[in-house]
Amino acid sequence: MSKQDVIELEGVVKEALPNAMFIVTLENGHEVLGHISGKLRMNFIRILPGDKVTVELSPYDLSRGRITWRKK
């Protein structure tokens, strides 16, 4: 999948799950299951409930996404 195919949305982390998975509520009200991208995992970026994040969604499965950025 190329970088052009992804859908980037903003959201707020609602709940932290095991194995670095999170339930994220998007701006449009939908909830998706998100996992941390490699760079966030490598640099030990902590994501807690209530954090604003950027999520990349695949057009093939809109219920799962990758957390690529944590807002300040």
UniProtKB/Swiss-Prot annotation:
- Cross-referenced InterPro entries, in alphabetical order? NA-bd_OB-fold, RNA-binding_domain_S1_IF1, S1_domain, TIF_IF1
Q: Write out the GO MF terms.
A: ribosome binding; rRNA binding; translation initiation factor activity
Cysteines engaged in disulfide bonds, as pairs: none
The listed locations are: Cytoplasm
Coiled-coil-forming residues are none
Q: Which residues form the S1-like domain?
A: 1-72
The principal location of this protein is: cytoplasm
Q: What keywords appear on the UniProt entry?
A: Cytoplasm, Initiation factor, Protein biosynthesis, RNA-binding, rRNA-binding
Its biological purpose is as follows:
One of the essential components for the initiation of protein synthesis. Stabilizes the binding of IF-2 and IF-3 on the 30S subunit to which N-formylmethionyl-tRNA(fMet) subsequently binds. Helps modulate mRNA selection, yielding the 30S pre-initiation complex (PIC). Upon addition of the 50S ribosomal subunit IF-1, IF-2 and IF-3 are released leaving the mature 70S translation initiation complex.
What the entry lists under NCBIfam families is as follows:
infA
- How the protein assembles, per its UniProt entry? Component of the 30S ribosomal translation pre-initiation complex which assembles on the 30S ribosome in the order IF-2 and IF-3, IF-1 and N-formylmethionyl-tRNA(fMet); mRNA recruitment can occur at any time during PIC assembly.
Family in the record: Belongs to the IF-1 family.
**Identification of the protein by name:** Translation initiation factor IF-1
**Lineage, highest ranks first:** Bacteria, Bacillati, Bacillota, Clostridia, Peptostreptococcales
